[in-house]
Curated annotation (Swiss-Prot):
NCBIfam families: acyl_carrier, PRK00982.1-2, PRK00982.1-3, PRK00982.1-4, PRK00982.1-5
Domain Carrier: 1-76
Gene: acpP
Description of post-translational modifications: 4'-phosphopantetheine is transferred from CoA to a specific serine of apo-ACP by AcpS. This modification is essential for activity because fatty acids are bound in thioester linkage to the sulfhydryl of the prosthetic group.
HAMAP family per UniProt: Acyl_carrier
PTM annotation (O-(pantetheine 4'-phosphoryl)serine): residues: S36
The protein's name: Acyl carrier protein
PROSITE patterns listed in its UniProt record: CARRIER, PHOSPHOPANTETHEINE
Keyword Lipid biosynthesis carried by entry: yes
Signal sequence bounds: none
Family: Belongs to the acyl carrier protein (ACP) family.
Amino acid sequence: MSIEERVKKIIVEQLGVKEEEVKSESSFIEDLGADSLDTVELVMALEEEFDIEIPDEEAEKITTVQSAIDYVQNNQ
């Protein structure tokens, strides 16, 4: 499974959205209905899945599906 597929799978599980709703340009809050707690839990799930640490200042920049994919790809 690619990084993109793994990230999207985590988003589907964490936010309870349908897979087809999760597009690269989707914003977690505006498009996928996440709140601030959801985004924190999403970052924690990404850290666990990919065995990385995401500092708070970086986590705040992860607001879309693509930004999550890019962050993981650049920090693995």
